[in-house]
UniProtKB/Swiss-Prot annotation:
GO terms for cellular component: mitochondrial inner membrane. It comes from Blastocladiella emersonii. This is Mitochondrial-processing peptidase subunit alpha. The keyword Mitochondrion applies. Heterodimer of mas2 (alpha) and mas1 (beta) subunits, forming the mitochondrial processing protease (MPP) in which mas2 is involved in substrate recognition and binding and mas1 is the catalytic subunit. It is found in: Mitochondrion inner membrane. The keyword Magnesium does not apply. Substrate recognition and binding subunit of the essential mitochondrial processing protease (MPP), which cleaves the mitochondrial sequence off newly imported precursors proteins. GO terms for molecular function: metal ion binding. It comes from the Eukaryota. One of its GO terms (biological process) is protein processing involved in protein targeting to mitochondrion.
Length: 474
C-alpha cells in the first residue's frame, strides 16, 4: 500500500466526540498500539489570570497528582508508580493539561486518578507551602537563564502584560505570597467538567465515555466561570524592552561572557485562521537553528536563516524562526544570539531577513518547506502522547479536530503567492523586540532599522568574516 493510501486509510478513521450532561467533552481517535494515551485539557491557564491571582496557574500545575479527598499523597504516588509513572501536568497560556500513557488494562485507574487530581484535590497547607518554595526557586532559576526567560519577556511586551502577556511562571515574590484561598478559588472557578475535554487514543470511544461519565462528577454545585478566550483582551500592542544582566565579579572562577539574546516578532492570525498554513510554511522556510548542530549535519541546512545568516556570519551563535500560535492571535518572529561585540550589526541582519522574506521565493524552496512541514507533522503524530494532545487542544479550542489528511491537504494547497502575501502583511505591522544581555548599549532598534530598509530600498549589511559593513542594494 502506498504512503498516500495508508494516510487516506488512517484519516478515514475520524475522531469521535461526545458531550456529556455535565458539559465535559470526550474525544477519541483509534490506534493499534498496545498502550492507551489519555489526557484532560482544561480551559484555564495564565490567560485568565488577573493582578490578584497572577501566577496561580503555575501552582495548579505544580500541585497535580498530590493528595486528594480520597487518597494521601503517598497513596497517589504509589498508584502512579503502579501505572508506570508516565503522567504529567503542565500549564500553557490558554490551557492546563494533564495526560499520560498507560497499558490498556490500567485505563480505568488512570481516568479515576485524572478525575481526582483535577476535581477533588485536597490542597493541604503543607503541600502549598512546599510548592511556594519550589516555585520561587524555579522562577529564580529561570531568570538566571536568559535564553529561556526571553520568551516570557516577548509575550509580556507584545501583549501589554495581560491576557496572553501573562507569564506561565509565577514571579518569586508572588510565589512566596500566594495564598491557599487564591488557589482554591481558581480550582473552583475554572477546573469544572464543563470547561474540560478528555481525549484518548488507543481506547474504544464508548469505553472512555463510560469511564469519564463515572469519574468526572462535579464535587461542587457552584457554577463555573463562563468566561472564554474571546472575552479576554489579548490585543497586540508591540514595543521594545531590554534587560541588562549584571556582570559577575572579574574574579569569578567560572565566568564566561554572556551572549546577547534578541527576539523580534510580529502579530499573525490565530491558529484557527486559514493563514495558519502559509505562516507555518513560512516558519519552516526561514528555519534556522544554532551554529553548532548537536544532531549532526543536514538538518534544515537549506533554510533561509542557515544559508543567509548562520553560514555567512561567524559571530552569530544562533538564529531561528519561531511561531507562537493561539486561538485569538499569534506571533511570528526570529530569535537570535551573538557575542556582544557584534551588537551593532545584529538588528541589521534580522531586519534584512524580515524584509527579504517575500522576495525571490523559488518554487524549490517553497516545495521543500511544505514537504518538511508535512513530514514533521506526520512524524509527530506517530507518537500517541502527541496525538492525544493534538485532539485535546483542537477540541478545546474549536470543538472539532482537523484530521491529519485535512492538515496535509491544506499545507499542499499553500502557494508561493500565499507566502508573499502573509510575509508582506507581517512586516507591515509594528514589531516587538526584546533583548537580554550584559551590555546592550550598542544594540540598535529594530523598528528604526526596518524603517530605514523600507525608506531607502538599500541597507548596510555586515560582512561576516570581517565584521565590517558593505553597501548592498535590495
Amino acid at each position: 500500500m502506498s504512503p498516500a493510501a495508508q494516510l487516506a486509510k488512517a484519516a478515514a478513521r475520524s475522531t469521535c466526540m461526545t458531550r456529556l450532561p455535565s458539559g465535559i467533552r470526550v474525544a477519541t481517535a483509534p490506534s493499534n498500539s498496545h498502550f492507551a494515551a489519555v489526557g484532560v485539557y482544561v480551559d484555564a491557564g495564565p490567560i485568565y489570570e488577573t493582578s490578584i491571582d497572577r501566577g496561580v496557574s503555575h501552582f495548579v500545575s505544580s500541585l497535580a497528582f498530590k493528595s486528594t479527598h480520597g487518597a494521601t499523597e503517598s497513596q497517589v504516588l504509589k498508584t502512579m508508580a503502579g501505572l508506570g509513572g508516565n503522567l504529567f501536568c503542565t500549564a500553557t497560556r490558554e490551557s492546563i493539561l494533564y495526560q499520560g500513557s498507560v497499558l490498556h488494562h490500567d485505563l480505568p485507574r488512570t481516568v479515576q486518578l485524572l478525575a481526582d487530581t483535577t476535581l477533588r484535590p485536597a490542597l493541604t497547607e503543607e503541600e502549598i507551602a512546599e510548592r511556594r518554595a519550589t516555585i520561587a526557586f524555579e522562577a529564580e532559576d529561570l531568570h538566571s537563564r536568559p535564553d529561556a526567560f526571553i520568551g516570557e519577556m516577548m509575550h509580556a511586551v507584545a501583549f501589554g502584560g495581560r491576557g496572553l502577556g501573562n507569564s506561565i511562571f509565577c514571579e518569586p515574590q508572588r510565589a512566596r505570597n500566594m495564598t491557599s484561598d487564591t488557589i482554591r478559588e481558581y480550582f473552583a472557578t475554572y477546573l469544572h467538567p464543563s470547561r474540560m475535554v478528555v481525549a484518548g487514543t488507543g481506547v474504544a470511544h464508548a469505553e472512555l465515555v463510560d469511564l469519564v461519565s463515572k469519574a468526572f462528577v462535579p464535587s461542587s454545585t457552584r457554577a463555573p466561570s463562563s468566561v472564554t478566550h474571546s472575552d479576554i483582551e489579548t490585543a497586540y500592542v508591540g514595543g521594545s524592552h531590554q534587560l541588562v544582566i549584571p556582570k559577575p565579579p572579574p574574579t569569578h572562577p567560572n565566568y564566561e561572557q554572556t551572549l546577547t539574546h534578541v527576539q523580534v516578532a510580529f502579530p499573525v492570525p490565530p491558529f484557527t485562521h486559514p493563514d495558519m498554513f502559509p505562516v507555518s510554511t513560512l516558519q519552516v522556510l526561514m528555519g534556522g537553528g544554532g551554529a553548532f548542530s548537536a544532531g549532526g549535519p543536514g538538518k534544515g541546512m537549506y533554510s533561509r536563516l542557515y544559508t543567509n545568516v548562520l553560514n555567512r556570519y561567524r559571530w552569530m551563535e544562533s538564529c531561528a524562526a519561531f511561531q507562537h500560535a493561539y486561538s485569538s492571535t499569534s506571533l511570528f518572529g526570529i530569535s537570535a544570539s551573538c557575542v556582544p561585540s557584534f551588537n551593532p550589526h545584529l538588528c541589521n541582519v534580522l531586519a534584512g531577513e524580515f524584509v527579504h522574506m517575500a522576495r525571490n521565493l523559488s518554487d524549490e524552496e517553497v516545495a521543500r518547506a511544505k514537504n518538511q512541514l508535512k513530514s514533521s507533522l506526520l512524524m509527530n503524530l506517530e507518537s500517541q502522547v502527541i496525538t492525544v494532545e493534538d485532539i485535546g487542544r483542537q477540541v478545546l479550542a474549536q470543538n472539532q479536530r482537523l484530521e491529519p489528511l485535512e492538515l496535509v491537504n491544506n499545507i499542499s494547497a499553500v502557494t508561493r503567492d500565499d507566502l508573499v502575501r502573509v510575509a508582506e502583511a507581517l512586516v507591515a505591522k509594528p514589531p516587538t523586540m526584546v533583548a537580554v544581555g550584559e551590555d546592550l548599549t550598542k544594540l540598535t532598534d529594530i523598528k528604526e532599522t526596518l524603517a530605514a530598509f523600507n525608506a531607502s530600498g538599500e541597507a548596510l549589511q555586515p560582512v561576516g568574516s570581517a565584521g565590517s559593513f558593505g553597501r548592498v542594494t535590495m
